[in-house]
Amino acid sequence: MGKNEEVKLLGIWASPFSRRIEMALKLKGVPYEYLEEDLENKSSLLLALSPIHKKIPVLVHNGKTIIESHVILEYIDETWKHNPILPQDPFQRSKARVLAKLVDEKIVNVGFASLAKTEKGREVLIEQTRELIMCLEKELAGKDYFGGKTVGFLDFVAGSMIPFCLERAWEGMGVEMITEKKFPEYNKWVKKLKEVEIVVDCIPLREKHIEHMNNMAEKIRSA
């Protein structure tokens, strides 16, 4: 990385979408400036950099603006070649992309929908979420991480979203969503993630995060 390179990340402390970008930048050893945003009072910088989406994360690299977390992760991987994030094999790379979409589209949609329901109306959505997470359980069989022996793209996407976001929301509601008995590979993977310094450095503080997720769930239910 050149000495005069500018790398800025606009994000939110509790957002898995910006946490995963920090994980990738730390894996690559790329120095960056982090700018905390407030989506209820969006900064003029965020609106200028992302006038259409108006969402985080936003990466700024030498004046170029990159949005959407999956796109940003791939940009980081292609710009700084060392410590690859995506699998080198084309088939494995395509599979990682498909599973990342499963996480951020299907699991997120059903998982967050479960937060909006009362206890009685939550059961069907919880079971649907478990069925989707079982796809990840099968993919992790016999592996330390999704890519094998080292963390990468899908670990950042799934890790930031499920154990370190959705599970905390469910914990706040008293729901044990992903048991070790039914999901042994998944739980082994989460334990391995907690041993990775760059991941741990980017995980929001647990109690503060659970409180935040509880407040968000209350807002969803009362909307």
Swiss-Prot record:
Cellular location(s): Cytoplasm, Cytosol
Family: Belongs to the GST superfamily. Tau family.
Cellular component, GO annotation: cytoplasm; cytosol; peroxisome
E.C. numbers: 2.5.1.18
Protein source organism: Arabidopsis thaliana (Mouse-ear cress)
InterPro entries referenced in this protein's UniProt entry, alphabetically: Glutathione-S-Trfase_C-like (IPR010987), Glutathione-S-Trfase_C_sf (IPR036282), Glutathione_S-Trfase (IPR040079), Glutathione_S-Trfase_N (IPR004045), GST_C_Tau (IPR045074), Omega/Tau-like (IPR045073), Thioredoxin-like_sf (IPR036249)
Cystine crosslinks: none
All copies of domain GST C-terminal, residue ranges: 89-216
Recorded catalytic activity of this chain's protein: RX + glutathione = an S-substituted glutathione + a halide anion + H(+)
PANTHER family hit by this protein: GLUTATHIONE S-TRANSFERASE U5-RELATED, GLUTATHIONE S-TRANSFERASE, GST, SUPERFAMILY, GST DOMAIN CONTAINING
Protein name: Glutathione S-transferase U6
Principal location: cytoplasm
GO biological process annotation, one example: glutathione metabolic process
One MF annotation (Gene Ontology) recorded for this entry: glutathione transferase activity
PROSITE patterns: GST_CTER, GST_NTER
Biological function: May be involved in the conjugation of reduced glutathione to a wide number of exogenous and endogenous hydrophobic electrophiles and have a detoxification role against certain herbicides.
